[in-house]
């Protein structure tokens, strides 16, 4: 059985630490440039340095995305950025552009180069091409089936790794190379500034009636013809193992700590259970399915893994997320009184019942006994986002425990 890596996203230093604690084998992050997530918090040089050190202390790898499709004017900055990354010693760079790949090979040859799914890697000849250029890993295009990935594995060297997205948002465009955002808003998805027009509501115009906008109804709110369901392969871990995939990748470099912790913890347990015993994996399936629905998500699909998706892979009647839990904060130490420090994310009150989410899979229901602000004043509720508070939940807590509330 191949050693499987669980690769988890992180939008910030805080989320990286959560990903590490909640079960990631590797974390992928973006810096302040060239990482295709302009809206994400992303990592400063200092945050990246601290994050890589933290991950390495816990035996976890860090990969940095440099997957921009570069123009001529980007190239001097790319070279300078890669020179900076060389000092930080990430475990790999994730790259889509052949020119950027070549520059990385020249500037920091000692850092592994992984080829991004953005490079449209749909066949074993492409994998062999990248292998010949020095790639250690190639990310499979989202449009590939399990059977196609298995065939690729049969035609490539054992030391060339396959990375595949197994959970998260799906892009309407071929491997995410979308032009809709650029066309409608002038913001280029391939430069990290996607405005997600695939989630908008659309009307149609008949050619001879250019000023008449006609709605297309799925329900009273209109239709969302490009709006994909989210990918979820938690029920198909055996097939992913059998396909010869080396890295199971979670989408979500814009997601919250609660989302990352929930998905990482669930897939960590599913992978470990299956490695111990296929029967144990099947026995715990209700737990996986329950947990994976405890963070904000859309309806689920298996994408292209079992052939071309049917119309059931799309959400036509709305563009909303499903939400089971609200994220309240992360435990970040204690004060002199033994109260636990958190930075509040959503309102909660004294007397309210909430839940502590622990990395080992345990969820503990507790009642908020006390809330104190930084000046030592008692509060009945915590209404201000990102306010630093000290709380008593009547139960011992640990660093990086996550607090959430069932809705």
Give short role names for the model-derived ranges.
Residues 76, 113-124:
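Gly/Gly-Pro- and Ser/Thr-rich, intrinsically disordered tail segments characteristic of DNA damage-repair
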Residues 108:
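Conserved phosphotransfer cores of two-component systems
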Residues 64-65, 95, 115-117:
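Short beta-strand elements of ligand-binding domains
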Residues 39, 117-121, 140, 224:
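Alpha-helix capping and helix-loop boundary segments enriched in small/acidic/polar residues
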Residues 1-10, 15-21, 26-33, 51-52, ...:
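Surface-exposed amphipathic alpha-helical tracts and adjacent flexible/coil segments at the periphery
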Residues 99-100:
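Alpha-helix capping/helix-boundary segments
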């Amino acid at each position: 059985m191949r050693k499987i890596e669980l690769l988890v996203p992180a939008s910030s230093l805080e989320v990286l630490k959560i990903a590490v604690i909640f079960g990631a084998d590797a974390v992928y992050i973006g810096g302040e440039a060239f990482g295709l997530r302009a809206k994400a918090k992303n990592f400063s040089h200092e945050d990246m340095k601290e994050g890589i050190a933290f991950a390495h202390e816990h035996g976890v790898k860090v990969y940095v995305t440099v997957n921009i499709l570069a123009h001529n004017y980007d190239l001097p900055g790319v070279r300078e950025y890669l020179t900076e990354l060389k000092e930080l010693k990430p475990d790999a760079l994730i790259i889509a552009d052949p020119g950027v790949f070549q520059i990385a090979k020249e500037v920091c040859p000692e850092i592994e180069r992984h080829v991004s799914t953005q490079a449209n890697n749909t066949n074993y000849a492409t994998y062999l091409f990248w292998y010949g250029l020095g790639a250690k890993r190639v990310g499979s295009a989202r449009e590939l089936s399990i059977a196609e990935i298995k065939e690729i594995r049969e035609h490539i060297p054992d030391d060339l790794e396959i990375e595949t997205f197994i959970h998260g948002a799906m892009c309407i465009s071929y491997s995410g190379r979308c032009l809709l955002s650029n066309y409608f808003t002038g913001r280029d998805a391939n430069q990290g500034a996607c405005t997600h027009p695939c989630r908008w509501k659309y009307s149609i115009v008949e050619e001879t009636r250019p000023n008449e906008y006609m709605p297309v109804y799925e329900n009273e709110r209109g239709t969302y013809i490009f709006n994909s369901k989210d990918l979820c392969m938690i029920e198909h871990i055996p097939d992913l193992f059998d396909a010869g995939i080396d890295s199971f990748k979670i989408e979500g470099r814009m997601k919250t700590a609660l989302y990352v912790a929930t998905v990482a913890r669930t897939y960590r347990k599913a992978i470990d259970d299956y490695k111990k015993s296929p029967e144990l994996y099947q026995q715990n399936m209700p737990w996986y399915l329950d947990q994976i629905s405890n963070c904000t998500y859309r309806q689920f699909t298996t994408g292209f893994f079992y052939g071309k998706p049917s119309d059931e892979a799309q959400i036509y009647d709305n563009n909303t997320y499903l939400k089971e839990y609200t994220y309240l904060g992360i435990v970040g130490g204690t004060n002199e009184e033994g109260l636990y420090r958190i930075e509040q994310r959503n309102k909660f009150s004294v007397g309210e019942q909430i839940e502590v989410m622990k990395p080992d899979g345990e969820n503990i229901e507790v009642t908020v006994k006390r809330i104190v602000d930084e000046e030592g004043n008692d509060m009945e509720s915590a209404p201000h986002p990102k306010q630093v508070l000290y709380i008593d939940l009547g139960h011992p807590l640990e660093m990086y425990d996550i607090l959430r509330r069932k809705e």
